């Protein structure tokens, strides 16, 4: 690879934060400062990103018991016909 830093992840605005004011003091919490010479904007990258681990294990979800609706319709759901009835009042979707 060449000496240029790989900044493909900065193409989305959600990953980019503009620097304003005195950048010397505001850069202490950031690892890399990237400056786009053509536009003059500066982007900051955080020291570490925190990711939440999402379980993709489907078997855990399948073993959970289904919760029954309290006060719900007995039998088949009326939504399969495109309407809902509650205490004699019908609502169409």
From Swiss-Prot:
- The RPE1 insert domain sits at 8-55
Q: Which InterPro entries match?
A: RPE1 (IPR005728), SDHF4 (IPR012875)
What are the start and end residues of every segment in region (Disordered)? 1-24
Q: Which Pfam families match?
A: DUF1674
Give the domain of life: Bacteria
Coiled-coil blocks: none
Q: Hey, which family's this protein in?
A: Belongs to the SDHAF4 family.
Q: Write down what this protein is called.
A: UPF0369 protein RC0209
């Amino acid at each position: 690879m060449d000496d240029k830093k790989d900044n493909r992840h900065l193409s989305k605005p959600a990953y980019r934060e503009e620097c304003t004011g005195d950048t010397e003091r505001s850069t202490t919490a950031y690892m890399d400062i990237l400056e786009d010479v053509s536009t003059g904007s500066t982007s900051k990258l955080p020291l570490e990103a925190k990711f939440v681990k999402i379980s993709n294990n489907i078997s855990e979800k399948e073993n959970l018991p289904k919760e029954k609706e309290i006060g719900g319709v007995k039998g088949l759901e009326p939504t399969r016909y495109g309407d809902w009835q509650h205490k004699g009042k019908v609502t169409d979707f």
